[in-house]
């Protein structure tokens, strides 16, 4: 890194700030949801669309971001991503209704979807191959710090200012980043194949419509007949994509990916696994504030042990998988995460608040081990010519499954809860207890998929390399 030219180091700093902005925004919002609900006149149990709108937009836009960067240029797309993200943040802060906030989060998600993959592509183009790993480690470190700072920073801003400031802090950073991008970043372009617009639109419609339908009649305000039509529309769109992609070399995601058995198992397990674990970052701060009466600041602080456990486990996950094999690790961590989530609820209901940080630290460790194992299992056996496409599909599935997880969490809260519940009341405890039981079951179910993973026949020599490609 030290022998790189000054201009290249500045370009890496720009990419690193983009990673930081995007990752910070994934966790800073969760702590503020109850305060947002109070300000907007909504029930805290119905605020999940603030999270879903952002994550789902990222999932939908991810497949197009790399192609746009190659076609239009990395500087132009990265600048556009920062501008859209910053404008989305401004509109979020100006929002006076939940619908306005959701629309602003969609705009923010479009920028966020382009920021990280285009940033990775930028590093690939400006750094020599032998220094690529060191450069990626440098630019992704702020992305790991963002989730750590997000909950606590969100809690501080909500408690001592207002929820609007969790979005307003993005604006000066975004302005500086946009100016620096125009001044310092070269506009690399590449020859690209024709973009599969038909496949992109079919997948986008299918993902968005099915996620909306999951929100139910209470969330969408639609009749059961209209919801049924949405489901049919989503299924039809996915079916049409499968027909479109069959024997199509220009398809957005080739169906040849699924000829690799471990990819099929890993992708289905990753989808099901992240539906369950995607509920936890949303549910935990909401439960701490609405269920236990914690302040936003203290709820944010309680999330830090979970992130610390996750970051700490990344250092030894390679050895764990090589020692015990994928099947044992994935089945054990899936069932373990379900048990730890039940332990968290039990400790909270018993009033042993001093033990909650330890439980959350353990939850972070188990979750991190499972995530890394799922990622590498999915990609490790793909042929080189399909590795990039497989990685893109996995990234999209990761975002989609998390949005579905948050949607299901909101659906469960709405099903068990009333329109408005008082903080730290018996009614709220009952609502969260039933929701947590359902969530623990959903978290455990992917163990049935991972039990089908074949026994490892050799030590995994590529887990470390593949794991970094999915960070």
From Swiss-Prot:
The gene is mdtD. One of its GO terms (molecular function) is transmembrane transporter activity. It is a multi-pass membrane protein. It comes from Citrobacter koseri (strain ATCC BAA-895 / CDC 4225-83 / SGSC4696). GO terms for cellular component: plasma membrane. The keyword Transmembrane applies. Its main location: membrane. This is Putative multidrug resistance protein MdtD. It is found in: Cell inner membrane. Keywords: Cell inner membrane, Cell membrane, Membrane, Transmembrane, Transmembrane helix, Transport. CDD domains: MFS_LmrB_MDR_like. PANTHER family: BLR6921 PROTEIN, MAJOR FACILITATOR SUPERFAMILY MULTIDRUG TRANSPORTER MFSC. Pfam families: MFS_1. It comes from the Bacteria. The chain crosses the membrane at residues 12-32, 49-69, 77-97, 102-124, 138-158, 165-185, 197-217, 222-242, 263-283, 286-306, 342-362, 396-416, 431-451. Belongs to the major facilitator superfamily. TCR/Tet family. Disulfide bonds: none annotated.
